[in-house]
Amino acid sequence: MTEAKSYKDTVNLPQTRFDMRANANKREPEIQQYWQEKGIYADLADNNPKDLFVLHDGPPYANGALHMGHALNKVLKDIINKYKLLQGHKVHYVPGWDCHGLPIELKVLQSLKSSERAELTPLTLRHKARDFALKAQQEQAVGFQRYGIWGDWKKPYLTLTPEYEAAQIGVFGAMALKGYIYRGLKPVHWSPSSRTALAEAELEYPEGHTSRSIYVSFPITQAGEKAAEILAPYIDDLAVAIWTTTPWTLPGNLAVALNPELTYAVVETESHIFHRSYLIVALDLVEKLSETFGVKLTVKVTLQGESLENTCYQHPLFDRVSPIVIGGDYVTTESGTGLVHTAPGHGQEDYVVGQRYGLPILSPVDAAGNLTEEAGKFAGLNVLNDANEAIINALQDQKVLLKEEAYEHKYPYDWRTKKPTIFRATEQWFASVEGFRDQALKAIKEVTWIPTQGENRITPMVGDRSDWCISRQRAWGVPIPVFYDEETSEPLLTEETINHVQQIIAEKGSDAWWELTVEELLPEAYRNNGRTYRKGEDTMDVWFDSGSSWAAVANAKNRPLKYPVDMYLEGSDQHRGWFQSSLLTSVAVNGIAPYKTVLTHGFVLDEKGHKMSKSLGNVVDPYQIINGGKNQKQEPAYGADVLRLWVASVDYANDVPIGQGILKQLVDIRNKIRNTARFLLGNLHDFNPETDAVAYEDLPELDRYMLHRMTEVFTEVTEAYESFQFFKFFQTVQNFCVVDLSNFYLDIAKDRLYISAPNAPRRRSCQTILQLALENLTKAIAPVLCHLAEDIWQFLPYEKPTESVFQSGWVNLDAQWQQPQLAQKWVSLRQLRDGINQLLEQARRDKVIGSSLEAKLIIVDPRTAESGTDEKQGENFVHWFYGWLENFNEPTFDPNDRKISLRNIFLTSQVEFIKSAEIEPSFTYEETVVINLERHDNNIRTKPIKIIVTKADGHKCERCWNYSTQVGSFSDDPTICERCNEALQGNF
């Protein structure tokens, strides 16, 4: 008995060194090293032919390890930058860091012993803070680069460098000389725990804050002119009722504000149980206050709010009389009494009203939050601790406390120390937003906001905001370059002094403010002018630091950037942070927004949609995603591309989830894309596009349909990138790899690729499509899966078109590939194929067949002799479609025949067409497949086509595994079919 002949070496199996596994932890750093050694980013950034695109980096804080928010933000930016590079734009991305401010200062102080803190000078603290910031910045930079982020890493911008600080002084100076900077005693958000003023963006409002709210009666001493007659019967036993959630501010009370549009009532208290028998309250609140006080209130008389103006009352705890004044629409009947306790030193609205009435600014609280001597017997008490208790007790002693109750509400906390803040009037430096508010609002309208609700968020923030307090009482920051006359305390701030300090800081850095004497810091003209000066001790708000980056970076002469820049991209919290501070400084100095487009993203949550916190144990660490955890089996190293794919998969306009379940799904998708590319690479091992590619007009229909499909897919991908909707890229590419390629085209292609003669036209035609799909797919995924794309490119089995995939340009689509009419037929055919696959799967499950090649497919002629009028269009299509199917004859053995048979498409050994009358009962499986037929008027008609699956005829070919009745017909090769016989001779 002769041994069976082996045909293994005659089959064109895939060949590639491209690994099935990503080995990301090893391979990604190698690819990053390759980019660096070849200078890929620098070459493209400088030499691409199209206009410069600048996405200006919002500086993360140089403090602590990177978290998922950093990853989301930086990867989004990098996807956009890499897409722009592939589109041919020059791109200069300068990563930045915010290096000054309280958080770093606190970290330094926490690292010192109490004895060291006591001896700390401002300069020593600054040196330690600088070292801390630089170390954190360098660690973060390494992390960002491991994400695959491209940028000018050798020359980032740091807000602590002399050139940056000097540019910031320049912005401050320009605003000062325009009259937008002033010094004033105003209430500001003050953090007793940090002992400094805070900006709105440095506050947070945690849930669950409870205040001691009180209702208090202030005895009326004299009625105002308009109310005298109405109040006369009650004046000797009358009080005004107020409500406050901050009892500690009562020592600063200088007025009671009302709403002139509201109606107020004099009410009599049942049994006259209070200090005064009659109270003034808002009419709409009488019933509610009766319930609150637990006493019946009877309305005696009503009067309009404006008539109560200038009615006076006695402060219950201090020997002073104050007026009732007209406030604004902030006085409502939603809570309280409709009358608001007003302390101009402890609130912005109170301050504005106080200025209108010429009230003094009384703020008897020191930097630590302790009441001062101006608070009389309450001096020394802390406003956030024991002051409330003492003041409430004193009110009770005076019998003016109407009610106390716990009140849960949102209250501002210091975002760093996590402790409550207060409003406190202090001498501060302000930017007068009022001076350029209208310009800022106009500039907002000229910006493209993505998503569009971003404009709706920032507009009221700018429209309603008060002047910007830009001074801080800390050492680690850029100094406000002001001098004070020793005799009068008048500030000295002129063009000459600002320019002189700016030049010094440009040369020596801001430490010079502390190192040099006043004489050295002053221009010569001010050194001997008969006056003596002292340096100011305030530093600038860090939001002024980062808000000046458009001047220090984008508009810097030593950087190849531009101003305004194309895009700012940060989290949605930056509408009140960096987006706003940048807008205000740029508009104040130049009258324009510093950006053309602003894109915002949400926050990262855990898999269940909860906020991440160490206490909950639900923190996902980007470092661990990339490098794996301690137990690599439970927490494997997924690499940066999986992290980047996650960013592209989510709708970042909202808050986005991440967790192990999501990551595992993304790994599967990354692997599917990788394995698709590996198949393409492996089947191009002997293909040279220069000599082997088949011209479009010579391609069979299936291949031309796939080119049409590529135009659809990669046009959608391009639109996804252009609209910054990367989740659409994610869905489209995933679908293309799995549905169009793996499950359809490549499934069909294996027969042509493996079985045909190596140089057969039908095989070369298929390889032409594979090569175009591979290169376009690689380019399309490159902005997101940058390491995988480069890995694929480096393993191209023919001469690479360019050194790096990023030098190859964007996807290459030919207009002639678009063939919608051709596509319509193939869409219907794919629907038919899906139905056939289900029937084959059923036969497999029942073990009637193993492989689909063991089956013969029978298609029953759906054409009828007559058609009704309504169905005529659909019937005509069915006639034509069935006829088209019948034309898929077996290809001849002419070497130039590139036809694809239906059995290849359906992956069966035979396909047969029969009339319905010919159906025999022995047929095994029968099903009706409904296909959608698109009419000329775009209406859809559904038509059924009957299909039958039965056992294939003949015997199995040992080479291609198809069944054929001609197996055994060839004496030299008795175990192969007619196709394989011709293929071995080079004819098929």
UniProtKB/Swiss-Prot annotation:
Keywords: Aminoacyl-tRNA synthetase, ATP-binding, Cytoplasm, Ligase, Metal-binding, Nucleotide-binding, Protein biosynthesis, Zinc. ATP binds at K614. It catalyses: tRNA(Ile) + L-isoleucine + ATP = L-isoleucyl-tRNA(Ile) + AMP + diphosphate. GO terms for biological process: isoleucyl-tRNA aminoacylation; translation. One of its GO terms (cellular component) is cytoplasm. Binds 1 zinc ion per subunit. IleRS has two distinct active sites: one for aminoacylation and one for editing. The misactivated valine is translocated from the active site to the editing site, which sterically excludes the correctly activated isoleucine. The single editing site contains two valyl binding pockets, one specific for each substrate (Val-AMP or Val-tRNA(Ile)). This is Isoleucine--tRNA ligase. Pfam families: Anticodon_1, tRNA-synt_1, zf-FPG_IleRS. Monomer. It comes from the Bacteria. Catalyzes the attachment of isoleucine to tRNA(Ile). As IleRS can inadvertently accommodate and process structurally similar amino acids such as valine, to avoid such errors it has two additional distinct tRNA(Ile)-dependent editing activities. One activity is designated as 'pretransfer' editing and involves the hydrolysis of activated Val-AMP. The other activity is designated 'posttransfer' editing and involves deacylation of mischarged Val-tRNA(Ile). Zn(2+) binds at C957, C960, C977, C980. Its cofactor is Zn(2+). Its main location: cytoplasm. Its EC number is 6.1.1.5. NCBIfam families: ileS. InterPro entries: aa-tRNA-synth_I_CS, aa-tRNA-synth_Ia, Anticodon_Ile_BEm, Ile-tRNA-ligase, Ile-tRNA-ligase_type1, Ile-tRNA_ligase, M/V/L/I-tRNA-synth_anticd-bd, Rossmann-like_a/b/a_fold. A motif ('HIGH' region) lies at residues 60-70. Gene3D superfamilies: 1.10.730.20, HUPs, Ile-tRNA synthetase CP2 domain-like. It is an enzyme of class 6 (ligase). Belongs to the class-I aminoacyl-tRNA synthetase family. IleS type 1 subfamily. A motif ('KMSKS' region) lies at residues 611-615. L-isoleucyl-5'-AMP binds at E570. GO terms for molecular function: aminoacyl-tRNA deacylase activity; ATP binding; isoleucine-tRNA ligase activity; tRNA binding; zinc ion binding.
